[in-house]
Amino acid sequence: MAGGRRGEALVGAGLAALLCALHVQAACPDATVTQELLKDGFHRDLLVTVELGAAGEDAGGCVVAARIRLPPGIYVDPYELASLQQHNVTKAVLIPDAVDVEAPEYLAADLLVLLYMEPDPRCSCCFRAALPVHGRYHRPADGSEEALVVLKSPQVLLCCCHNHFAECRKPAEVEAPCLGKNVGPCRWHSLTHKPAHEELILQVPVGLRQHSSLVCVVTLLSTALCATLILTAVCKYGHF
């Protein structure tokens, strides 16, 4: 008799745990992240969209951000970003905030960007933001006129004023302010998500190695010609 009651208790506990897990799964937003590159050439716009699913309607009061790691092949111009933030076009934090925009790809380092998302008026559970990115100079290649820069899917971060999604979040090691909430760092949490695509590939135009000699000769001739024209003008019209 005691064994039967013990078995019933175990079954009841198992059902309770299962129902609790199902409740948590239903309460957690099924986040989906999409990345898209706009424009062509070296100067592009990275459009990031986060869809929180049906449970995302409870995200009111939360700040949503995308933590993006940019590889050495691309960068964000901090001066351009400051101008955009001044006009409330794009809001982001660069880590580190000092970026060498002149460095080539093989001398640059990864760049971490915390991109604050804005609610998408076309979707009640969606957030989106665009980040201007620029391709760096790459070494000349053999046989290919394009270098491939791989962008991994960003991490989704939440900064909430309430306890919504508390069971869905994990503390994230990010020191950045919750936009519009305070001026100091706040506690960010990462949200489990599924990327629409694991990675995004950016094609950057590069020169061909077999053209190196021709480029050097043309550059030297152009430099010599310009220097000669300048010296001629100085000697002819200069007052000594």
Write out the residue ranges for each language-model feature.
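Non-cytosolic ectodomains/luminal loops of secretory-pathway membrane proteins
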Residues: 20-199
